[in-house]
Amino acid sequence: MSNKQKIPCFVLIYEQVDIIKKCLSFLIKYSDRLNIIIVENYSSNTQTIIKPYVIDLINNKLIWKYYLFEKNIYNVAIHISINHAIKTYLDPNEYPYVYVTDGDLTIEDSNWIDEQLSILDKCPNAFVCGCLLDYSNLPIETIPDSVGWIQKYTDRGDYNVGITGTVFNSYRTPVLIEAMKYLNDNGLKYLDYHLHHYHHEIKNMIWTCTKKAKSYHLTWDLYADPENPYTIYKLRNYKTMWFNNTEASYQLFEHDDINNQSDNQSNSELDNRPNIEPNGQSNSEPSNQPNNEPNYQSNSEPSNQPNSEPNDQSNSELDNQSINEPNTEPNTESNGQSNSELNNQSDNHPNNEPNSEPNNEPNNQFNKPDNEPDDKIILKVVSTGFGKGTEKSGLYFQDQFYPGTRGFNIYTITQNKSITFQNYDSSGKQCIGELVRYIKTFYDTDHEYLIVLVDDDATRSININFMNEVVELYDLNKMYMLRVRSSYYFVYNLKQKKLIDENASDFITVKNSYNRKDLDLLSETQTTTINPTTINPKTNNINNPTNYVNVDESIEINNLNDINGLELDGLKTVKIMSEDNSDLEFSENEIEEPIEPIKYHIVCRESIYHYFKDYVESFIDKLNSDQSNNPKEKSTANSIISNQIHIYNYIDSPNHVYIFCQCIDDHLFKKSFNKMVIFTEQLTKKQELNQISRYVNHKIPVIHYSIENMKINNNPTDIYIPYQYNKKEIKVLRNLYLNTPKEYDVAFCGSMSPRRRKIIDDIKSNGLKVLELVRGYWGNIRDCSIAKCKVLVNVHYSHDYNVYEPMRCDRWAFATMPIVSEDSIYDELLDVKKYGLVTFCPYDELVTKIIQTLKGANKHNLSAIKIIKHSRKKKFYQTLQHL
């Protein structure tokens, strides 16, 4: 078979020699069908073991190409390699299929390639076909939460539907090229999470998976040993959220017989630098060593960030979740594989661990471009302020933009040039205490820079007494200017304990030399400064903004530049005119501690939030509503939707309540901050009762969406919040249902099971058209599809699922769509049954009842909707008093 008939197969490897050799030995068995392309991130084993091993395979024509990166840049290495392949040799006319996989996997089934290609041929709407994982070595004993890595799939006959990690993923080449274009256009990298989002949300395609072939995960074997340094490393707690956009130079090795790229790499890619021979010497200097390596190219694209993490390959495991749904957020893993199983790994692990990066990489292996300037723009702060146009506030760092949102945007940069980010919407006073505590935590850390960026009018009500804690700690003399409704930022050097600059202008650029010795400030506009040296006669304290204000006299300032040179003493009040003419006056004598209302935080893993979004949004606005004239009784709410919730900085305060969706990480149980959990699993299942007992035993209040679950659990501390009538949501759904032409008789939405399949097949046998929305349909796509149907049916998944699903049904019942539901365990407690909004019947009568409903007139029971709406609203506010 010629090379053009073979399938290119990208294999990402890193550091673990035994695992790499097992994986490549497996792949080489199929070298007659695969053009194997190795993508290696540099490690301590590269020069002495891995590189010679791979070069030998190339010389024996067992490996097609070998991308060797100068350092560990995680999955970005696979991203760069695929981009290069698309530009140079990955022609879909010559190579209709392509594989991408992690290098720690093997497959026993010898027909795995044929099975995957057959699935792609049978399913034209398939985005990719991954390989099913073998869970026989799942490390449950050492990592009990690994049960959450098990993925559920929908059986489609010859194949499964459900997401995988980078587990022998087979693509149609045009599909992969289009996906890479999307990633590049949006500044994204080849990561599981981005691809999961792209295939479903952007392309509305399905992710398929093998049924017969199973992949064995070699890295899981490492976890079987609890004393293994890597296992210990895995089980640590990490407190940093990483934004990885690191890039690096690479060398491309390929055999003479198949090297067709010598003229394909652009000058911009090569940076006009001299060709580096395999022995590391420039071709301008003759080498005395024989050249026994294949031809290669050096693409020394400059890296904007140093290697800050030891991990790179995307893997198939799922994040530690107590429910069986995938965490699609990819996280990097120190065995060289970017692994959704591993979350938030730090870069400062001990050097005696197997994933440590070497410090002795050969300097002449990868050269800096000859024309690289000595100085390089590395950081730009954009603070748009109020009414300053449409440009987005945020931080440009290492050619990556990190957008801010309204309020205080707190960025920190570590010594390894990784970014952390936190936002506080300070349009009111309630967040200031939390904001101050957060900023103060970085003062004695190993972070290098602290950037505080203000966006829009977030600082109008800031309390100076609170901010003084930060002002005094960081010696920020002009902090009281944050009272101005305007743009503002400051950059603080945490190592040198000094302010680099603060400015009320729009832009700032920080420039430094290539070796990062120091920072020099460049500003595009004139800096606004104040030299507050006046001493308040009452306190004799310098550099405290509250020392400059009193109530005897006022000075109006309509422009920030008017503050320059202004001397303030103890006899004057500063009165700052905001741009909407709302005056802001403050004085030391008048400042009071703000009354912080209760702030509710909805906390959920981003990967599962779509299950809870409709329910949470039905009542979150009510948390923000003012039901009392007493400020102490008012509340606010915000959402923390992230796959990093296990490392979030939770505030231990009576004014902060964190409401978790479905699960709370075990290590948070003993934390003293206020916490609750929304539990939506069916308590007619014994295992779910065991799960909920964990929260009860730790005295964590449980919020139920189902009154039936409330009765089953029978715990006096439980809280019932029924699905609320959300006027905005119901208006959209009602318009959809009433105005969408009907293409189907019945809509079914949910995971498929034999019990459900029987009902659906029986409905079809009666000549009715059924729309099956099975897994992966969420949001507007789901709603627009359901609106094409006349009736929605609710069938329990199995015999032990006996609780009515209000999150699926109630919103459509409010929108006047007829609902037919199977009886549930305590359905006599349901208001939708009491007032006839939903039709209930036994399982065996569902088909008959659906036919009767379709034949009958669809009478809009608006009076019942109104009664239920107000009843639930009243119940919610009664519940809120006890939260």
From Swiss-Prot:
Biased composition (Polar residues): 334-347
Low complexity: bias regions: 259-268, 277-317, 324-333, 348-368
Transmembrane segments: none
Cysteines engaged in disulfide bonds, as pairs: none
UniProt-annotated stretches for the region Disordered: 258-373
UniProt xrefs under InterPro entries: Nucleotide-diphossugar_trans
Family: Belongs to the mimivirus L137 family.
Protein name (database record): Uncharacterized protein L138
Native source species: Acanthamoeba polyphaga mimivirus
